[in-house]
Amino acid sequence: MVTRQSTIILIIKLLFMSVLLNLKKVNLKYQTGKDNIRVLKDINLTTKKKETISIVGESGSGKTSLIMLIGGLEKATSGKIFFQNHEITKLSEDEVSEIRRKSIGIIFQSFYLIPNYSAVENV
């Protein structure tokens, strides 16, 4: 059972109306020494225009790893990620960074505000 204390909610807001996100059989493994730890297995996700999605799950269930993949901050071990019908899994880091800056907003449930900054400056 997922309780309030063990749940972290991550919200992805796709900022541009034309944005479409599609994940196909995405997998992510982390290498720790000689071992591979599978974090995500065969994730499929499709978003529609103007859609806001929430990812809810227990601590350690892979929510942050999924967000990092969508935001281009991690590379999938396998599978494909499409953004505006372009496969971003084949793009360079610079190209993915440009897309992220222009089109993807990520809000984590726990965040820290910088004192003396306005709400806009903290974003």
Report each predicted region and the residues it spans:
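The feature captures the beta-strand-to-loop junction immediately N-terminal to the Walker
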Residues: 56-58
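ABC ATPase NBD coupling module
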Residues: 88-105
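Short coil-to-helix segment of the ABC ATPase nucleotide-binding domain corresponding to the Q-loop/switch region
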Residues: 117-122
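A short, flexible loop at the N-terminus of ABC-type nucleotide-binding domains that lies
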Residues: 17-20, 29-42
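Conserved Walker
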Residues: 64-65
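Helix-to-loop junction immediately C-terminal to a conserved catalytic motif
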Residues: 71
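Conserved ABC transporter NBD signature motif
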Residues: 79-87
